[in-house]
Amino acid sequence: MKYVIVGGVAGGASAAARLRRLDETAEIVLFEKGEYISYANCGLPYYIGGVIEERERLFVQTPESFYARFRVEVRVKSEVKRIDAEAKRVTVSDLNSGKTYEESYDKLILSPGAEPVRPPLEGIGEEGIFTLRNVADTDLSLIHI
């Protein structure tokens, strides 16, 4: 059985770990659009505020450690652009190379996360107004503080 998981932060990483416990022989491929997986996204404000002093403490797993522990193939900087449920294939864009390829699956799990709501307020798009959802948002905020 081959599982493809879209999203590698909280839900996707948890699903992958659970799948491995349930099926030791399954092929599991996890796609994450961002650079990091399985990080403490609830800790991001604490890092900005200095309560968590070391950035590395935000990261629970790396792609390498996740593979070593769970035998899950993790592909970061990989955006799933299209799902063909009938053919059981996803189209993936490798954000490093710009190349696009297809990956087949038997079962698909979607855990792509969310986007912050930006209310239609005057000035919401001005410099110095930030949303906080991921590590990249955190880094951008800290540059301006």
Regions found by a protein language model. Name each.
Residues 4, 64-143:
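FAD-binding core/adjacent interface of flavoenzyme oxidoreductases
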Residues 1-77:
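Beta1-alpha1 glycine-rich phosphate/pyrophosphate-binding loop at the start
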Residues 13, 143-144:
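Low-complexity, intrinsically disordered or weakly predicted helical/coil tracts enriched
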